[in-house]
């Protein structure tokens, strides 16, 4: 197991680059010795660093505006639906986020209600807002109808007053949840980190007859954000079993409650980080575990024989396939973010 920790440090840390042609044996073959508890602590520290790095966070978020359990449960239920088919090819992936921002009330009266939505500054770092949905709850008298204008207000550069950029008309005829798909003006505002919506009924109504619900019915905006991904090639490998010393995948589970992160990570409760460990003889160099063909094995064996006695280089057991970690969490602004963090779960290992 001494090699497993070194491999995890070498191949799961994003900033580390390993060159198989480096002189000397593979670092996995070095004789460093760690007790089991030290290995576990270092692997947990590595998992925390990897998650924070890939979420572009310097430290875990401290929740400044906690969201009530009722509002969180309701928002997730409203957004939950059938799984959408991807439009991407199998060898192309894109990093996607869904960010949920709950409303703060800036102005409320009989005639209008103004809602403020705050998004993290990371939205402006090259991310594309693909869709913005506004969801709100209305309590309305029975057998009544009301027309409501929903205005998108933005603060333009070098201006101190909000400017009306677009307006939507919604017919309200019953109590319940209403959903409105917002246009490019709202998407641009979300990208800049702040969105203001103003709700104005067309006719005068009593204050008690039109109420935007709070607590479990708190209004929110859900923004879908996308970042271009990289090409992936999936390769198969083998899992570690028994006393085998060949290159394989060792399972390792990270429990978010154990590391004290269950307050800001909503789902899942943990994830299987996994890592690669084991030996790689020269004749299996470049093979994905033992799944390569017999012809490839023979060619590599010939190359190994030709190199015998002329080199001290070794082959390393490295990840050959990874998959993303689906995460639902609170960001610095207490917004709820749903995303897939790429390359977090090692699925297969092979020899470099």
Swiss-Prot record:
- Main localisation, per the record? secreted
What keywords does the record list, in alphabetical order? Cleavage on pair of basic residues, Disulfide bond, Glycoprotein, Growth factor, Hormone, Secreted, Signal
Q: Which pairs of Cys residues are joined through disulfide bonds in the record?
A: 240-248, 247-317, 276-349, 280-351
Glycosylation-annotated residues: 111, 143, 161, 173
Tissue/organ expression = Mainly expressed in the adult liver.
Tell me the SUPFAM superfamilies matching this sequence: Cystine-knot cytokines
Which GO cellular component term is one of those annotated?
A: extracellular region
The places in or outside the cell where this protein is found are: Secreted
Q: Which residues get removed as pro-piece?
A: 19-236
The source's superkingdom equals: Eukaryota
User: Nucleotidyltransferase: present as a keyword of the record?
Assistant: no
Q: InterPro entries attached here?
A: Cystine-knot_cytokine, Inhibin_betaC, TGF-b_C, TGF-beta-rel, TGFb_CS
**Molecular function (GO) terms listed?**
growth factor activity; hormone activity
Signal peptide (from-to): 1-18
Question: In the UniProt record, does the keyword NAD occur?
Answer: no
Its annotated function is as follows: Inhibins and activins inhibit and activate, respectively, the secretion of follitropin by the pituitary gland. Inhibins/activins are involved in regulating a number of diverse functions such as hypothalamic and pituitary hormone secretion, gonadal hormone secretion, germ cell development and maturation, erythroid differentiation, insulin secretion, nerve cell survival, embryonic axial development or bone growth, depending on their subunit composition. Inhibins appear to oppose the functions of activins.
Q: Which family does it belong to?
A: Belongs to the TGF-beta family.
Q: Please describe the quaternary structure of this protein.
A: Homodimeric or heterodimeric through association with alpha and beta subunits, linked by one or more disulfide bonds. Inhibins are heterodimers of one alpha and one beta subunit. Activins are homo- or heterodimers of beta subunits only.
What is the designated name of this protein? Inhibin beta C chain
User: Per the UniProt entry, what species is this protein from, by scientific name?
Assistant: Mus musculus (Mouse)
The gene name reads: Inhbc
């Amino acid at each position: 197991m001494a090699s497993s920790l070194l491999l995890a440090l070498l191949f799961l840390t994003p900033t580390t680059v390993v060159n198989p042609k480096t002189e000397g044996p593979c670092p996995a073959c070095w004789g460093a010795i760690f007790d089991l508890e030290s290995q576990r602590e270092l692997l947990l520290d590595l998992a925390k660093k990897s998650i924070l790095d890939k979420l572009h966070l310097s430290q875990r978020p401290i929740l400044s505006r906690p969201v009530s359990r009722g509002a969180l449960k309701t928002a997730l239920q409203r957004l939950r639906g059938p799984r959408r088919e991807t439009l991407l090819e199998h060898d192309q992936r894109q990093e996607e986020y869904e960010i949920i921002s709950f409303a703060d009330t800036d102005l409320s009266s009989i005639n209008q209600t103004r809602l403020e939505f705050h998004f993290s500054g990371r939205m402006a770092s090259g991310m594309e807002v693909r869709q913005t949905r506004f969801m709100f709850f209305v309590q309305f008298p029975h057998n009544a109808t009301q027309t409501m204008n929903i205005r998108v207000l933005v603060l333009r550069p070098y201006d101190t007053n909000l400017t009306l950029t677009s307006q939507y008309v919604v017919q309200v005829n019953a109590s319940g949840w209403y959903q409105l798909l917002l246009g490019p003006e709202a998407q641009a505002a979300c990208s800049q980190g702040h969105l203001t919506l103003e709700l104005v009924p067309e006719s005068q109504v009593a204050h008690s007859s039109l109420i935007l619900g709070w607590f479990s019915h708190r209004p929110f905006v859900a923004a879908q954000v996308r970042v271009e991904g990289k090409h992936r090639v999936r390769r198969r490998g083998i899992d570690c079993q028994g006393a085998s010393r060949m290159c394989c995948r060792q399972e390792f589970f990270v429990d978010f409650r154990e590391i004290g992160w269950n307050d800001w990570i909503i789902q899942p409760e943990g994830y299987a980080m996994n890592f690669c460990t084991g030996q790689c003889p020269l004749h299996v160099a470049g093979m994905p575990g033992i799944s390569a063909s017999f012809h490839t094995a023979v060619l590599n064996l010939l190359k190994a024989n030709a190199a015998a006695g002329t080199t001290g280089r070794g082959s390393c057991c490295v990840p050959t396939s990874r998959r993303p970690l689906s995460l639902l969490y609170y960001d610095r602004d207490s917004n709820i973010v749903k995303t897939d963090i790429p390359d977090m779960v090692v699925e297969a290992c092979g020899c470099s």
